[in-house]
From Swiss-Prot:
Segments passing through the bilayer: none
One Gene Ontology cellular component: cell outer membrane
Family statement drawn from the similarity comment of this UniProt entry: Belongs to the intimin/invasin family.
Localization, UniProt: Cell outer membrane
PROSITE patterns membership: BIG1
Name assigned to this protein: Invasin
Function: Invasin is a protein that allows enteric bacteria to penetrate cultured mammalian cells. The entry of invasin in the cell is mediated by binding several beta-1 chain integrins.
Endoplasmic reticulum found in the keyword field: no
Keyword Ribosomal protein: no
One Pfam short name: Invasin_D4
Organism the protein comes from: Yersinia enterocolitica
Biological process, per Gene Ontology: cell adhesion
Domain Big-1 positions: 451-541
Cross-referenced SMART domains: BID_1
Length: 835
């Protein structure tokens, strides 16, 4: 709800209030002077009225030392605005207005305070005091109430107030006491915060809250020289970072003492100088000029020195504002943006033992690094091995024995314990450079009872359950004397056998054990003697793949020999324990058959893979081989098929190439067959379609049947592989002549020409058959299609057909042989229609 009262809003409120007051004052001055104070009896005349309700009107203006023209102008505007606002508000109580226009004529650092008496008698005044102000870009609302009682020549008062920093969301309550008499005013206040820490609006990584504290005000005047007076104020606040002298100068439990001189030569003008001194040599000096205009009094009295004495009396201070600090003094707290602790925080163990330690980080930002102060630790032989950004392995350093004379009598090892105790400190730093408080890790190295060394023989033996690895532990005292007949417990991990055994040292302090395993990898062997442990790692090597437990697969087993389609080889090697065999570096895939290309082998989490491509048609056998030994029982076969391709065209006993543009002539019920990969037997392995299914359909044998004219359009016949659906082959043709018999009766050349009308026949006989009887896809009817007698007799009657050798030379052609007889009287008309 307080967000409404931002700086701009407060500025607008005060500005509009000033403008409104100015208008009201100019129009209704006379009318207001005739009204009665709302909680007082009516007075007899305007002078008494103004005397009763306009006790104190003050305007304070601080003069800048530099005093340029702009400052003087703003000062004049400030003074005028203050006087007009006070003039209007003082009709309803006492106001103090501080209107500060800056260079842009905004109202930053302005304030308005209003004391409103709501019960007023000769002995008591009950009042409310309201205020609103802007300071340091914070808007503060003050709401208070109090009572003043008058006993003989003294006034005693008590007041309380609520202060609300609406901008920064800070709240406090204030309690004050007053004791005033003629020429002397004593005031004391206490301030108590109402809210706790929250994010500061002044600093990014700080919290803020009101600082609790108090102040004492003393103001006195000389009875003999009432124009001259002085003031003293002491204020102190509690807290570690308190902004008593501003947010840029934070102090711990700061205090300040303010002393000042007041000089009022005439009632209209008051001069003053204040000196404020505080902790750590803080020092401020302020010069003040105050101009007071007392309503209802004559102009002469405003400038009469004799009137000054009356203003120092208690009767004139009845409605003065409460002397207190309305601005909330803030305390700041550096946010602990990152915290560091260790778990565990204390380690205790024998030399060489390894412990895991985790850094517990609480941070608003990501961790950048942890800085260790471990020089003493490292020098002693300790190790701090990072496992991750927050996890460490701590390896304890050797124990430091001391000479017996250095030990405390009766407390063996006490001084040694101090020498063998290490404190490691660390600081965590986040990505913004914020540091945590140092965290400590205490490490206590215990005095060992034994010195245990280890020796491993035949490390790296096969994990076949038979081949052993021998581990020998030697146990001695600190002085290297062998420890005989000492019982110890040996345990192993990761499937090594025996998993646990109890044995005694021999005369040389030696305990030996032979280990076997079916599990590949590292096994930790631990010797425990009276709680003191020593460990050593042994490694069992991989067993070779067993052909019975292993598997090999190729997918797919059929591919196209285009050098692109892949078959994936997947080999899952398992040893005789049915364990997956990892780390094979000598795996190969051996091929036998048509040549193929095999990619490098890739080891995955649970298999080994490679890919196969080829360009040759046929079969190839693939066999995995490990260490030079082929696993023949796992052999798999891959068949490579030819790339789908239309290699020829069968037409009435002849086969044409696919690049000759066949057919150029077509006729009803003409037919031809496409040949896939050099053999029509392959045609059934494909699904056939035609782009002109109505006029040029194709059957499942790849036979194209001409059913109607295509009118010069390109016909596309597509063969899609049934085994490899993404692979297709196409053949396109575009006929340019549609040929037909003009009639079913024999006619003369003249009649045939008339029957076929404008058809040009010459192209139909430009065939090598006219000279040597051979066929070719040359665009001629018989050259492309051969004997017409093999086609539908209903379309082609048996006999000769008229055509033209030249534009005027008619000849006849035998429909069966393509021969051109020397002479013929009649024949069937052969017509051709362009498409």
């Amino acid at each position: 709800m307080y967000s409404f009262f931002n700086t701009l809003t407060v500025t607008k409120i005060i500005s509009r209030l000033i403008l409104s007051i100015g208008l009201i004052f100019g129009i209704f001055t006379y009318g207001f002077s005739q009204q009665h104070y709302f909680n007082s009896e009516a007075l007899e005349n305007p002078a008494e009225h103004n005397e009763a309700f306009n006790k104190i009107i003050s305007t304070g203006t601080s003069l800048a030392v530099s005093g340029n023209a702009s400052n003087i102008t703003r000062s004049m505007v400030n003074d005028a605005a203050n006087q007009e606002v006070k003039h209007w508000l003082n009709r309803f109580g006492t106001t103090q207005v501080n209107v500060n226009f800056d260079k842009k004529f905004s109202l930053k650092e302005s304030s308005l305070d209003w004391l409103l008496p709501w019960y007023d008698s000769a002995s008591y005044v009950f009042f409310s005091q309201l205020g609103i102000r802007n300071k340091d870009s914070r808007n503060t609302l003050n709401i208070g109430a109090g009572v003043r009682t008058f006993q003989q020549s003294w006034m005693y008062g008590f007041n309380t107030s609520y202060d609300n920093d609406m901008t920064g969301h800070n709240h406090r309550i204030g309690v004050g006491a007053e004791a005033w008499t003629d020429y002397l005013q004593l005031s004391a206040n206490g301030y108590f915060r109402l809210n706790g820490w929250h994010q500061s609006r002044d600093f990014a990584d700080y919290n803020e809250r009101p600082a609790s504290g108090g102040d004492i005000h003393v103001k006195a005047y000389l009875p003999a020289l009432p124009q001259l007076g002085g003031k003293l104020k002491y204020e102190q606040y509690r807290g570690e970072r308190v902004a008593l002298f501003g947010k840029d100068n934070l102090q711990s439990n700061p205090y300040a003492v303010t002393t000042g001189l007041i000089y009022t030569p005439i009632p209209f003008i008051t001069l003053g100088v204040d000196q404020r001194m505080g902790k750590s040599r803080q020092h401020e000096i302020q010069w003040n000029l105050q101009m007071d205009y007392r309503l209802g009094e004559s102009f002469r009295s405003q400038f009469s020195p004799a009137v000054v004495a009356g203003t120092r009396l208690l009767a004139e201070s009845r409605y003065n504002l409460v002397e207190r600090n309305p601005n909330i003094v803030l305390e700041y707290q550096k946010q602990n943006t990152i915290k560091l602790a260790f778990s565990p925080a204390v380690l205790s163990g024998l030399p060489g033992q390894v412990y895991s330690v985790s850094a517990q980080i609480q941070s608003q930002s990501a961790l950048q690094r942890i800085l260790w102060n471990d020089a003493q630790w490292v020098a002693a032989g300790g190790k701090l091995i990072p496992v991750s950004a927050t996890d460490y392995n701590v390896v304890l350093p050797p124990y430091k024995p001391m000479a017996p004379a250095s030990r405390t009598v009766g407390k063996t090892g006490e001084s040694e314990a101090a020498v063998n105790t290490y404190t490691l400190s660390a600081t965590a730093i986040d990505n913004h450079g914020n540091s945590s408080n140092p965290a400590t890790l205490t490490v206590i190295v215990q005095q060992p009872q034994f010195v245990i060394t280890s020796e491993v023989t035949d490390d790296g033996a096969l994990a076949d359950g038979r081949t052993p690895i021998t581990v020998k532990f030697t146990v001695t005292n600190i002085d290297s004397t062998p420890v005989a007949e000492q019982e110890g417990v040996i345990t192993t991990s990761n499937g090594a056998l025996p998993s646990k055994v109890t044995k005694k040292t021999d005369a040389q302090g030696v305990i030996s054990i032979a280990l076997t395993s079916f599990t590949v990898g590292v096994s930790v062997v631990t010797l425990d003697i009276q709680g003191q442990q020593a460990t050593v790692d042994v490694r069992f090597a991989v067993l070779p793949p067993d052909v019975t437990n292993s598997s090999f697969n190729v997918s797919p087993s059929d591919i196209v020999a285009d050098g692109s389609m892949q078959s994936i080889l997947t080999f899952v090697p398992r040893n005789k324990n049915n364990e997956f065999v990892s780390g094979i570096t000598d795996l190969e895939f051996i091929q036998s058959g048509v040549p193929v290309t095999i990619s490098p082998v890739t080891e995955n989490a649970d298999n080994y893979t490679a890919s196969v491509v080829g360009n040759s048609v046929g079969d190839v056998d693939i066999t995995p081989q490990v260490g030079g030994e082929s696993l023949d029982l796992l052999q798999k076969r891959i068949t490579l098929y030819p790339v789908p391709k239309i290699t020829g065209i069968n037409v009435n006993g002849e086969q044409f190439a696919t690049d000759k543009g066949f057919p150029k002539t077509t006729f009803n019920k003409a037919t031809f067959q496409l040949v896939m990969n050099d053999d029509v037997a392959n045609n059934t392995q494909y699904d056939w379609t035609s782009s002109y299914a109505a006029s040029a359909p194709v059957d499942n044998q790849g036979k194209v049947n001409i059913a109607y004219k295509t009118y010069g359009s390109t016909v596309t016949v597509t063969a899609k592989s049934k085994k490899f659906p993404s692979y297709t082959a196409t053949y396109q043709f575009k006929p340019n002549l549609w040929v037909f018999s003009g009639t079913m009766s024999l006619q003369s050349s003249v009649e045939a020409s008339r029957n076929c009308q404008r058809t040009d026949f010459t192209a139909l006989i430009e065939s090598a058959r006219a000279s040597n009887g051979s066929r070719s896809p040359d665009g001629t009817l018989w050259g492309e299609w051969g004997s017409l007698a093999t086609y539908d007799s209903a379309e082609w009657p048996s006999g000769n057909y008229w055509t033209k050798k030249t534009s005027t030379d008619f000849v006849t052609m035998d429909m069966t042989t393509g021969d051109i007889p020397t002479s013929a009287a009649t024949a069937y008309p052969l017509c051709a229609e362009p498409q």
